[in-house]
């Protein structure tokens, strides 16, 4: 089984234009993501999928590989689907999708998803990771996506709101979605052909498209958190984390 890691990256973020090229300790964010992801064991290849020549030049400048996609992708997974076709991946190839705004991605989290597919081949088409929230302020932060799952660790829902809501207590675990996906190449193509979901559009969470159309998402719980850069002020948090590591 080939394992291809793809990092979708776009320049035109409404909250943070040029985010993939933002410097973190003197190195562009996309380079941090690429280099940390490449430390994961079991990868066949790794590419950045982008539609921007500036990002392409930066990635190639540090020795990374790039696949150029169109600017019309509706979501990161739609961009991944285009990259799959351009790279000529086989239906049973495993695709790992790491977001371009995760400069502190833990390589062992990537390995955890690969191992999940290797241990349970054919049992699911898509998987992702969660992390039990420690900082309670994150629970009500809409930029921190929360998730709930059933007893067999299949996703029930993802939301920017607090889920579940404890009517009589606030003392219960809440899980953050880490935003890293693994799926078969064939399923990515299936996903991209699905119409935009109503809940996906409301929450602006692409993974809800799969749930709305009856597809299961397997969940594994990670021991490590991942800091996503959503706003310029998150850069300082990343630099603090890197300094402490």
Curated annotation (Swiss-Prot):
Where is this gene product found?
Cytoplasm
| Gene3D superfamilies noted in UniProt | Spore Coat Polysaccharide Biosynthesis Protein SpsA, Chain A
- Has the keyword Nucleotidyltransferase been applied to this entry? yes
Q: Does the keyword Transferase apply?
A: yes
Which EC class, in a word?
transferase
The entry's cellular-component GO terms read:
cytosol
Q: In which pathway does it act?
A: Bacterial outer membrane biogenesis; lipopolysaccharide biosynthesis
Supply the EC number(s): 2.7.7.90
Pfam families xrefs: CTP_transf_3 (PF02348)
- Catalytic activity as recorded in UniProt: 8-amino-3,8-dideoxy-alpha-D-manno-octulosonate + CTP = CMP-8-amino-3,8-dideoxy-alpha-D-manno-oct-2-ulosonate + diphosphate
Name the UniProt key words of this record, in alphabetical order: Cytoplasm, Lipopolysaccharide biosynthesis, Nucleotidyltransferase, Transferase
Q: Which SUPFAM superfamilies match?
A: Nucleotide-diphospho-sugar transferases
CDD domains on file: CMP-KDO-Synthetase
Q: Name one GO molecular function term.
A: 3-deoxy-manno-octulosonate cytidylyltransferase activity
Q: What's a GO biological-process term for it?
A: lipopolysaccharide biosynthetic process
What PANTHER family does UniProt report for this protein, alphabetically? 3-DEOXY-MANNO-OCTULOSONATE CYTIDYLYLTRANSFERASE, 3-DEOXY-MANNO-OCTULOSONATE CYTIDYLYLTRANSFERASE, MITOCHONDRIAL
Report the family membership: Belongs to the KdsB family.
* UniProt-recorded name of the protein: 8-amino-3,8-dideoxy-manno-octulosonate cytidylyltransferase
Q: What is the lineage of its organism?
A: Bacteria, Pseudomonadati, Pseudomonadota, Gammaproteobacteria, Alteromonadales
Instruction: Point out the gene that encodes the protein.
Output: kdsB
């Amino acid at each position: 089984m080939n394992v291809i890691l793809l990092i979708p990256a776009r320049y035109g973020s409404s909250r943070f234009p040029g985010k993939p090229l933002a410097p973190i300790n003197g190195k562009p964010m996309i380079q941090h993501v690429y280099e940390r992801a490449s430390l994961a064991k079991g990868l066949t290849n790794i590419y950045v999928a982008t539609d921007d020549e500036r990002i392409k030049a930066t990635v190639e400048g540090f020795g990374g590989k790039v696949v150029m996609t169109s600017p019309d992708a509706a979501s990161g997974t739609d961009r991944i689907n285009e990259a799959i076709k351009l790279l000529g991946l086989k239906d049973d190839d495993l695709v790992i999708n790491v977001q371009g705004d995760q400069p502190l991605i833990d390589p062992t989290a990537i390995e955890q998803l690969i191992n999940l597919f290797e241990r349970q081949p054919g049992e699911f088409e898509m998987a992702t990771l969660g992390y039990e929230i420690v900082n309670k302020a994150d629970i009500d932060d809409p930029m921190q996506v929360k998730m709930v799952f059933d007893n067999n660790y299949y996703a029930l829902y993802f939301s920017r709101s607090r889920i579940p809501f404890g009517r009589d207590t606030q003392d219960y675990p809440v899980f953050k979605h880490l935003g890293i996906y693994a799926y078969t190449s064939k399923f990515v193509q299936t996903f991209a052909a699905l119409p935009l979901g109503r809940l996906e559009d409301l929450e602006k969470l692409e993974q809800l498209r799969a749930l709305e159309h009856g597809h299961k998402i397997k969940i594994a719980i990670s021991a490590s958190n991942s800091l996503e850069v959503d706003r310029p002020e998150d850069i300082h948090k990343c630099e603090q984390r890197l300094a402490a590591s």
